[in-house]
């Protein structure tokens, strides 16, 4: 399966073995553009500018929704699958309990400027990483919620860092500000 989210408010599941150009399933619950899609085992997690994160359990066909109060630019699972990291247009990254929806932490300081910023956890589930409009990567301790570091390996830093990807097993991640892509080691935070 390939899963896509779109500005037309839909999430489509495509069977790549099929000879048809039609999606196998279309999920139309979002009321505004779908900003991110993440998949973990049997769950599909979507974020939308309608202010909601939606978690589809495709094993049993159930939908779980949490309202965040502002447009959601990115949502991702923690590595242990127990929590969800949520970036919102209000400039706050939130850590939510996946099952109860309880707010476990808020991470602030980075600059959102209404950009569609991505955030994630590191490989060990100990740090929150987020892009920022100030051209830096902001990293917080997951438990204390304090800023660990701000990485600024991009020269010049006039471009916002909007996209990042954490390697699922190795202690490294990639980030881009548009014209450049850099890789960091999360253990030493060296470029």
Where are these regions (language model features)?
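Structural hallmark of WD40 beta-propellers
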Residues: 1-3, 42-45, 62, 81-85, ...
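Short C-terminal beta-strands that terminate individual repeats in beta-propeller domains
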Residues: 5, 23-29, 63-68, 103-110, ...
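Conserved strand-to-loop turn within each blade of WD40 beta-propeller repeats
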Residues: 5-8, 47-50, 87-90, 131-134, ...
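WD40-repeat beta-propellers
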Residues: 11-16, 53-57, 93-97, 137-141, ...
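Short coil turn/linker residues within repeat-based beta-strand modules
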Residues: 18-20, 60-62, 100-102, 144-146, ...
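Canonical WD40 repeat/beta-propeller blade segments in eukaryotic WD-repeat proteins
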Residues: 31-39, 70-77, 113-120, 158-165
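Loop/turn-rich, solvent-exposed surfaces of beta-rich toroidal or solenoidal domains
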Residues: 87, 91, 102, 110-142
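Blade-level signature of beta-propeller repeat domains, shared across WD40, Kelch, NHL, RCC1
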Residues: 162-191
